Amino acid sequence: MTEITPGSHGQGDSPPPGSPGASPNVGPVRDSVADLPPGTPTGAERATDEATAAVVGARRPLDIGQDIDLPAGTGAATVGTPTLLGLPQTRQVVQPAFDEHHPPDPALIGDCVHCGFCLPTCPTYVLWGEEMDSPRGRIYLMKEALEGEPLDDSMVRHFDQCLGCMACVTACPSGVQYDKLIEATRPQIERRYERSRSERLYRDLIYNLFPYPKRLRALRGPLRAYQASRLGNLLTRTGLMRKLPAPLQAMESLAPKLGPVERVPERTPAVGQRRAVVGLLAGCVQGTFFPDVNAATVRVLAAEGCDVIAPRRQGCCGALPGHGGREEQALDFAKKTIETFEQAGVDYVVVNAAGCGSNIKEYGHQLRDEPEWAERAEALARKSRDISEFIVELGPVAERHPLPMTVAYQDACHLAHAQGIREEPRKLLRGIPGVELKQLTEAELCCGSAGTYNMLQPEPARELGERKAAAVLATGADLMVTANPGCWMQVATTLARMGERMPVAHTVQVLDASIRGVPVEELLERALTGPGTALARPTPAQS
């Protein structure tokens, strides 16, 4: 029976999978399987499994309860008596990587045919070319874990290095739901794997600060004082900044310029005839660090005929802890958000942060196990809209004044990939007289923000930020526009670190300026120097 290897084109043996020049389509394809007994793996299936196993070192599944020597911190339970020094013996009983509470679905894992179309869209595979840092490699690791492999340091590292950008979901011709798989894996890691003490402390800091608007607002005063003192410049010049742990350096550099808080009214009436009553999700980071975006959102919605209700007692929607695998915390936030907007009595909930919008639209799935919440969660998910999605759906009626400028629109992953919203923001920007859109190269590639990724994985995030910043600069545009606060901070900070000055704004701020007749020069100046702009300092090599 003849076997051919895709990508060889009759020019001899193709390079081994995972090596430079290898085709992403791993494995031979048979011309017929009619003579194979039922259940026999095809050549493609056998070769793919063999190739992937070779990449991961031919790790074989372990029997549950099997004794094996493992380093501490693998998530396995230690057995036996302590040594004389009080340290545990190294003989450990291997526990299954995943518990029974919603592990990755084997049926979804089986949907992956290892075709490789995801590889050029995966940020970590693009950076390193490592099979296990690709979607299909991580799916293979999930399969291993389901078969009994423990959650060791290496496996967890590959999962942690995934940005969760969902570009692979967009690229996959087989419709593999990698988003569901990685979102099921992260809570398992948080429950089953013991991280180092320093990492636990840092993660606790992030997830006990950023999802809490009151705590963030309390931080504004000290942070503004720090920015005004220019202490950061001194720390950078003396080299002391480089002595901080990389995650703390990343957190310090990402903080945008803070200005006065522009709080939106609890209720804003429509201009002219009322067309809808909408609720505004203020957001945690958006509401604290980018209050101008919320103010612009309210003005645009009112101009388009909407009564806007911004509930005072709203909090985090659960996106940040949810993406970090902190399931219990995320579900608690989700329930509070549902109650808040049920009480508000709105027709729609409008969101101006891509990560928050994609999370709310998954409430029904997240709360599927709780009968008293499942239907309510699905109801809120159905009425949630991104600001650009909502205005296009409603139909814009407010007059647009000219803004003669070129715009580089940067797709936020959780808008383009997670929600499938690409054309709506572009349509709204093109509807402004004088605006010319510029296309970015590698538009599908994540900028490296990915929720808390740029604080937890600063090195790959920095590399991805530099690629995105270079792509933005290459357009020669007057203004970069995006739809997510994380993307804004990531790209703006990278541009500043590179010594480049480029204005950055949210889509709705451009719409607001056009509706209000703000001169283009004023818009660009505020986007370059106003609140929300980057304060990162050029690296020493460029200063």
Locations of the language-model features?
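Short, charged low-complexity linear segments at domain edges
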Residues: 79-104, 132-153, 271-277, 291, ...
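A broadly conserved sequence feature marking short terminus-proximal activation segments
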Residues: 3, 61-91, 118-142, 414-417, ...
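N-terminal glycine-rich, Lys/His-bearing helix-loop that initiates the first secondary-structure elements
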Residues: 3, 8, 19, 55-56, ...
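N-terminal intrinsically disordered, low-complexity tails
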Residues: 6-81
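Iron-sulfur cluster-binding electron-transfer modules in prokaryotic oxidoreductases
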Residues: 3-6, 178-543
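Iron-sulfur cluster-binding cysteine motifs and their immediate structural context
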Residues: 111-113, 117-139, 161, 165-188, ...
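Non-heme iron-sulfur electron-transfer modules
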Residues: 80-98, 125-157, 175-204, 500-508
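Cys/His-enriched microdomains
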Residues: 110-116, 120, 160-163, 167-170, ...
